[in-house]
Design a protein with these regions (language model features):
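Hydrophobic core segments of beta-strands in well-ordered, beta-rich domains
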Residues: 41-61, 85, 100-130, 138-140, ...
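A compositional/structural signature marking long, glycine- and acidic/polar-rich segments
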Residues: 186-290
Length: 423
């Protein structure tokens, strides 16, 4: 457990850690990073009264995995962010081993938060952290301002999940339809099949099991589900674990993508499309979206991945690790989800350089945006740096980055579609 008082007391002893972070040349210029320590999933995203609230999984005193808090940033323009005090602490018995991922739902001027309280029963003889020895408590509380919260209350526990589920059920997200509230939870069955559990409520407090969304033999665990409507269609974004690579498909450690869902809520039946990856970059996981006051569906994700073979030692040496992706505005057309940077990002632009030369001298800056126009479609190789390359060969667009031992690895690809890469 860690109360706010525990955090503040330990914070006083880590000045050298904060000083190390300030000295690091690898700190990013326009991505949200942990002030110190380790960041992963974005959580509880919303905008209220003109203020964006961005929470995230946060381990403040180590640059690796540890007991999770919720970190907190706020912004009025999505360009300038304020670092707030941590928002949630593992300070009750129901979340003593970490306040895991969750979400926010705003209605009638009240913010409803839902998250998974993690409890490890390591003293039990049958403890294996998969099928026994773990509590996955779904916890709810409210707030009027995004800072002060009501008392935490348990709304779902292990006994409320289907009997064939393992102890891996987590990451609640709320979706409203026809005056009912639906909660999705990522899950893993006892026989290692990934799925999403669907619960239904009239009041955001009392939830009853409603259904599950699943696909045969498609991973052993589905994490971080997000069910939402976009341009008149219903989508389920999810992160399946345990899918084998097929050519360029599913090349990441774990996948991040979506299903288009045709759900008949009157009869509680559904049809589901094939899974499509949202992003083929290697550092992408646990996306979460929200509607802002301009009615834009904005998505953040963790710019990292669990269990990666490579590490981030250069930043770990300076006592921090990972960041959130740039926020993306989602839309649906041509039978796929499109992702574009926020218009607000244009406000980061400074001097414009126009060049028709083959070689462009780099300006004295660590960040730049490159726009390249082609007058006809043909194969090309664009060498951005010695270790970064963009190519279009045989109808496949590949982005390469030098990750390991000066060998260019394919970082993402698109095939025969219009793309905008923001480098």
């Amino acid at each position: 457990m860690m109360t706010k008082e525990d955090y503040l007391n330990e914070y006083k002893t880590h000045k050298s850690m904060r000083d190390n972070v300030k000295r690091d040349n690898y700190r990013l210029q326009y991505h949200l990073m942990p002030p110190t320590g380790f960041l992963n999933d974005p959580n509880g995203l919303f905008q209220k009264d003109g203020v964006y609230h961005i929470y995230f999984q946060y381990t403040p005193f180590t640059a690796g995995w540890g007991t999770k808090l919720w970190g907190h940033y706020t912004s009025k323009d999505m360009i300038n962010f304020n670092q707030e005090e941590p928002f949630l602490y593992p300070d009750i018995s129901l979340d003593r081993d970490g306040v895991y991922s969750g979400s926010a739902f705003v209605e009638d001027e009240t913010i409803h938060y839902f998250y998974t309280g993690n409890v490890k029963l390591t003293d039990r003889e049958d403890y294996d952290y998969i099928n026994s020895g773990r509590e996955q408590n779904t916890i709810h509380m409210t707030s009027k301002d995004g800072y002060k919260i009501s008392e935490k209350e348990l709304i779902l526990s292990n006994d409320d999940y289907p009997i064939d589920m393992s102890k891996h059920v987590r990451d609640p997200k709320i979706f409203k339809k026809n005056n009912y509230y639906y909660m999705v939870l990522g899950g893993r069955t006892s026989d290692n099949q990934g799925c999403v559990l669907l619960y239904k409520s009239k009041d955001l407090i009392n939830f009853e099991y409603y259904n599950r969304i699943e696909v045969d033999d498609f991973g052993y665990m589905w994490e971080c589900p997000d069910l939402f409507e976009l341009d008149g269609e219903l989508f389920l974004v999810v992160c399946p674990q345990g899918i084998s690579q097929r050519g360029y498909d599913y090349a990441n450690v774990y996948q991040t993508g979506y299903f288009k869902v045709d759900y008949d809520f009157d009869n509680n039946t559904y049809k589901i499309s094939e899974f499509k990856e949202l992003d083929r970059g290697f550092d992408i996981y646990a996306p979460q979206s929200f509607l802002d006051e301009k009615n834009r569906r904005i998505q953040y994700a963790w710019m990292g991945i669990p269990d990666a073979e490579y590490n981030n030692q250069p930043t770990v040496d300076y006592c921090w690790q990972h960041a959130l992706t740039m926020p993306r505005v989602l839309s649906y057309k041509n039978n796929q989800i499109y992702q574009q940077p926020l218009d607000e990002m244009k406000n980061l632009r400074l001097e414009k350089i126009v060049s028709n030369c083959k070689n462009i001298k780099q300006k004295d800056t660590v960040v730049y945006e490159m726009q390249v126009d082609f007058d006809k479609s043909q194969d090309f190789v664009l060498q951005i740096r010695d270790d970064v390359q963009l190519s279009y060969l045989n109808h496949v667009l590949l982005f390469f980055v030098d990750i390991i031992q000066k060998f260019l690895l394919p970082f993402l690809y698109f095939q025969d579609i219009l793309v905008y890469l923001h480098l």
